[in-house]
């Protein structure tokens, strides 16, 4: 099950430098040129989770396999992208394919690196990108109205429901608000998702600051954080330049380097976790002497569907799930101890998997 987070931003905000650091590769050409990222670069990153290391230690697992999140570095957006300016058409097509958006905002001053708008104004940069995405959504929805109206007049129930959703979204977008803020009922979620709106995707703001501000941020990142709070979104402050340096170091060297900067952990770890939370994902584990492995599912997933992430046969033939809470697995020294303490539960088809569950599935072939 793949989950994709698209990295977006105006040209020269540090987007590709960040992507390179994320994937520990120089796949993206992080040059001081507006359209250096023409084809989207895709990279998978491990989601840091100390629980997995602890489980592997207890079970003496031979291998540790973390869950992964995919980041897509998308070509820099410019004003007018909704009308195909710059690399707008490619940008818009690619962003439709991701599940969430990490919006990199330039929060540093550097006379050697040009800003496409000529000044450092992170909130204005955010508005530029949001506006282009909203204009693209408006165009997309307006093209559907006539066809849906005709179908609705012919008593097409689905068309009536979709037309109502489209009209409500149009009102919101014309007010200058992204589609993700549209109030909707649970039963409307599927139809809403099918609209494929760019501004419906959850957003994480990444404040790219200068090295000296990596620990505490600066006035620019504070403004973005306040904007995120008002939106009910999340903002992460990092220095892409520092992260690209950290990416080349060994684990021991990273710890020493972070300490000298006054940082407890790499900014990328915070970013990856924030992306994971943004997508409302949780982790369950399978643990044994061969391997300890983390698996990604959406919050609210029931046991059979969770089993299906490992293999479709597990879901089709699901019987039950032997389940131990992470805290119990650790407290009682593993599966045998948890079983003896009565902490191993047999869960059926309606069980909603909890974050951190250690699971073993029983199924019919």
Give the predicted meaning of each segment.
Residues 1-114, 142-143:
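Conserved G1/Walker A P-loop phosphate-binding module
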Residues 2-8, 13, 19, 142, ...:
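C-terminal-of-GTPase-core extension/linker across diverse P-loop GTPases
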Residues 6, 35, 40-43, 50-52, ...:
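Short capping/connector residues at structural and topological boundaries
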Residues 22, 84-87, 116-119, 218-222, ...:
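Short, glycine/charged-enriched secondary-structure capping and boundary segments
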Residues 26-34, 41-43, 51-54, 83, ...:
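Glycine-rich, flexible loop/turn motifs
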Residues 35, 49-52, 65-71, 85-99, ...:
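Amphipathic alpha-helical transducer elements in NTP-driven molecular machines
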């Amino acid at each position: 099950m793949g989950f994709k987070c698209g990295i977006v931003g105006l040209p020269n905000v540090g987007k590709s430098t960040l992507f390179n650091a994320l994937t520990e590769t120089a796949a993206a050409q992080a040059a001081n040129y507006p359209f250096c990222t023409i084809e989207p670069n895709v990279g998978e990153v491990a989601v840091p989770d100390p629980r997995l290391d602890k489980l592997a230690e207890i079970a003496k697992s031979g291998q540790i396999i973390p869950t992964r999140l995919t980041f897509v570095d998308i070509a820099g957006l410019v004003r007018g992208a909704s009308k195909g300016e710059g690399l707008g058409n490619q940008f818009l097509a690619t962003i439709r394919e991701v599940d969430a958006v990490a919006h990199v905002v330039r929060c540093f001053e550097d006379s050697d690196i040009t800003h496409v708008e000529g000044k450092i104004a992170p909130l204005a940069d955010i508005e530029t990108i949001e506006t282009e995405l909203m204009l693209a959504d408006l165009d997309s929805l307006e093209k559907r109205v006539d066809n849906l109206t005709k179908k609705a007049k012919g008593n097409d129930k689905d068309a009536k429901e979709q037309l109502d959703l489209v009209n409500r979204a149009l009102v919101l977008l014309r007010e200058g608000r992204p589609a993700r803020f549209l109030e909707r009922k649970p039963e409307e979620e599927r139809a809403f998702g099918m609209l494929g709106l760019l501004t419906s995707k959850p957003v994480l703001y990444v404040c790219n600051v200068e090295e000296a501000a990596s620990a505490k941020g600066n006035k620019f990142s504070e403004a973005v954080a306040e904007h995120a709070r008002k939106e009910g979104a999340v903002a992460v402050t990092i220095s892409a330049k520092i992260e690209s340096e950290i990416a080349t170091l060994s684990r021991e060297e990273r710890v020493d380097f972070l300490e000298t900067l006054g940082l407890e952990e790499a900014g990328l770890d915070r970013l990856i976790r924030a992306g994971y939370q943004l997508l409302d994902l949780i982790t369950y584990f399978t643990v044994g002497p061969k391997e300890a492995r983390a698996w990604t599912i959406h919050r609210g997933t029931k046991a059979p569907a969770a089993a299906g992430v490992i293999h479709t046969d597990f879901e089709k033939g699901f019987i039950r799930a032997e389940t131990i809470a992470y805290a119990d697995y650790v407290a009682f020294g593993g599966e045998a101890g948890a079983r003896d303490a009565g902490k191993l539960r047999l869960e059926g088809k309606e069980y909603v998997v909890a974050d951190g569950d250690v699971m073993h599935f029983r199924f019919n072939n």
